[in-house]
Each structure stands twice: as C-alpha cells, then as structure tokens.
Swiss-Prot record:
Organism listed in the record: Saccharopolyspora erythraea (Streptomyces erythraeus)
Name of the protein in its database record: Erythronolide mycarosyltransferase
Note: It does not require an auxiliary activator protein.
Enzyme class, broadest EC rank: transferase
Family: Belongs to the glycosyltransferase 28 family.
Recorded name of the encoding gene: eryBV
Catalysed reaction equations from the record: dTDP-beta-L-mycarose + erythronolide B = 3-O-alpha-L-mycarosylerythronolide B + dTDP + H(+)
Length: 415
C-alpha cells in the first residue's frame, strides 16, 4: 500500500516517526514523507523519500506577548501538583483557545495544508500517518479518502486534554459549548469539501510508542509500538570509537536556557561543581562561551546520542522525547530538568518509578544538579530501576511487528 507520513518542520518530532516509516518500507510498502521545505534534509538524511510542500512555519517568530499566552498552557503541566487545575473547564478551554489560535494555524499554514491536500489527491495514499500537531495530515487524508492515524513521538497530551475537554463540553448547556479546535478545523477542512469530524482532531486511531508505565489513558483506539530511538544521521567521532574504562556522564539539551548557565561565569561555576564527579562529563549542545573548563569535562556541539549513552552511567537532559527514549533504551538513570509540554510529565514519571530524579528548571542550581548526579550514580537502585524500564519497553512489539495491524486498520477505515 501507499503510506504518506507528514510532519510540520520540526526535526526532533519528525525523528520520532522514522522507525515506523522504515518498518513500513521494509515490509514492502511505498512510503513518502510530506513536510515543509525546512525538513527536507532531515527526511533525506533518514533515507526516506521527501515531498516538500507549502512554506515553512514561523512558530518561533511569535511575539513575546503571544508566547506568554501559549506558555501558560504548555509549560509546567504538573500532573502531580496541579491535577485539579489542569482538569478544570477554564484551563481546558484556555488551552484549546490558545493552541487553536496561536500554534496550530501557524504550523499548519495555508500553503502547507493546500499543497499537502493537492499531493494526497494526486498520489492517492492508502494510509496517512501524521505527527500529532500536523492536523493538515488528517485533512489531506479525508480529502483523498485515505485512512489516517496519529503517530505519537511522546506523551499523548493532545489526545488526553482533548478527551477531557470534550467530556466536559458535552455536559454543558447546548448554548455554551465552545470548541475552538473544532471551529478552526471546520474552517480549514471546509476549503477542501471535507466535513469536520472528531477524527480530524485525534485521528481514526493512534500509534503510541511509549512503554506501559508512561502511557496516558485517552480511551481512544491505540496501537502500541516499541520505542526505537532515532537521533538523526550522524558520524561517530574518533574519541568515541573505542570503549572507555572511565565512567561517563552526558549532559545535553537546552543547557544555555537554564539559570545555572545564564552567562559564561555561571556556566563555568556549574561545570566546576559537576567536575567533582569521578569520571568524564560530556556536555553536548551550545552553552555560553567559557575560556576554560575542568580537565574531565568535554564540550562538543553534537554527538550520536545512541552511541554515547551505551557507555554512560547517567544523563542530565531537558526531557525531550528523543533523548529520554534513548536513555530508556540503554537502561541508564536520568536527571530531567524539564518544563515544556510533555517533558515535565515524563521526567516526573521516571523519578516516581525510581529510575531518575526530576528537577524544576526554575529551582535548579549548580549545587542541586551536582547533588542529584552523585545520588543517581552512587545509589545502584537507580540503575536497577532504569534497567527494569528498558525491559518493560522491550516487551512492546517492534514497529515491524505492528505493520499487519496497520494494514488491517487501513482496510477498515479507508474510503
């Protein structure tokens, strides 16, 4: 069958789609990836066939006032301490309004939707798999008669909050049932003769790649697949080609955005605290310029994460799904300094399961970070629990093993 994957131009979101794309390809299906032009190199680098459509989004160009409105509903979504607030009608409606006004129309811009629909109508895929913010994929699927599903790269917050919102909305008086996402999707789909249905918001089904302990209960039809982290095309550097008898720690992701790395002096103090660790610390990604670093700290712009973590005792990161999944896959303890979207939740879940420590970015400092590192490295129960989570993840079917199920669902939903 013909399978079309689609994602707005966000490299790490796309990377979460790659293992299933290749599973479908090696099963004999014709697979193409339609995305905004900025993603083309990443698609080609994954060895997949790219179809550039539309113009690039400008999500990260939104003005600070608008960003603040969006962040209210996407930062510090603390399920452990804000549960009542997060499930209130006011919060759920506010989230639907903010994302449907300032996020979804921006990443699904008019030219992207129109050209994606044109391509789908011409190529006639049997199945469209879409990244969960890329609602253009659902519209294109309905416009050409294809089956369609969301391919989740992380925690299903969109489906979870949409389900809670709809449950409360339908209990309200008929004259007071606003639906910002439904209104926006009705307008977008209507341009192509497609009527709104809830499947445009949540797919006809979803593919969830998180292990059982981390899945959110959405009540929606879901196909479970094993998380197989893909970190992008890469080359192993010389210093990483051979194993090392020295213990390693990895620090990656958004370091420069934390208060403990606000400037070169603060960054240097943070590194000095971490350097007390008996072993090598590999710091990846950009940070403030510093003239000197301790001898046991290696600063690198990029490193193949899957290769590095094979020989790491722990990782400190920002909670991103790809980094988290790679650490999970290798069974190492994780220290998450996270607050964005689903990053906080996974960090808290990992900590609750005894496989790591969660730290709030607005509270962490060099001392607390160094203390957490010592704790997860010196206490063997963290590694033991991380290995248990790895084993749990390995119990899920591989992407290749779910292909027959996707074929069956495609036959059921097509047309």
């Amino acid at each position: 069958m013909r399978v079309l994957l689609t994602s707005f131009a966000h490299r790490t979101h796309f990377q979460g789609l790659v293992p299933l794309a290749w599973a479908l390809r090696t099963a004999g299906h014709d697979v193409r990836v339609a995305a905004q032009p900025a993603l083309t190199d990443a698609v080609i680098g994954a060895g997949l066939t790219a179809v550039p459509v539309g113009s690039d989004h400008r999500l990260f160009d939104i003005v600070p006032e608008v960003a603040a409105q969006v962040h209210r509903y996407s930062f510090y979504l603390d399920f452990y301490h804000r549960e009542q607030e997060l499930h209130s009608w006011e919060f759920l409606l506010g989230m639907q309004e903010a994302t449907s006004r300032w996020v979804y129309p921006v990443v699904n811009n008019d030219s992207f939707v129109a050209e994606l629909v044109d391509f789908a109508r011409d190529w006639r895929p049997d199945l469209v798999l879409w990244e969960p913010f890329t609602f253009a994929g659902a519209v294109a699927a309905r416009a050409c008669g294809a089956a369609h599903a969301r391919l989740l790269w992380g925690s299903d917050l969109t489906g979870y909050f949409r389900g809670r919102f709809q449950a409360q909305r339908l209990r309200r008086p008929p004259e007071d049932r606003p639906d910002p996402l439904g209104t926006w999707l009705t307008e977008v789909a209507g341009r192509f003769g497609v009527e709104f249905g809830e499947d445009l918001a949540v797919g006809q089904w979803s593919v969830d790649q998180l292990p059982p302990s981390f899945r959110l209960d959405t009540g929606m039809e879901t196909v479970v697949a094993r998380t197989l982290p893909y970190n992008g095309a890469s080359v192993v550097p010389d210093w990483l080609k051979k194993g090392s008898a020295t213990r390693r720690i990895c620090i990656t992701g958004g370091f420069s955005g934390l208060g403990l790395a606000a400037d070169a002096d603060q960054f240097a103090r943070t590194l000095a605290q971490l350097a007390r660790f008996d072993g090598e610390i590999v710091v990846t990604g950009s940070g403030p310029d510093t003239s000197a670093v301790p001898d046991n700290i290696r600063l690198v712009d990029f490193v193949p994460m899957g290769v590095l973590l094979q020989n790491c005792a722990a990782i400190i990161h920002h909670g991103g799904a790809g980094t988290w999944a790679t650490a999970l896959h290798h069974g190492i303890p994780q220290i998450s300094v996270a607050h964005e979207w689903d990053c906080m939740l996974r960090g808290q879940q990992t900590a609750e399961l005894g496989a790591g420590i969660y730290l709030r970015p607005d509270e962490v400092d060099a001392d607390s970070l160094a203390s957490a590192l010592t704790q997860v490295v010196e206490d063997p129960t963290y590694t033991e629990n991380a290995v248990k989570l790895r084993e749990e993840a390995l119990s899920d079917p591989t992407p290749q093993e779910i292909v027959p199920r996707l074929e069956e669902l495609t036959r059921r939903h097509a047309g």
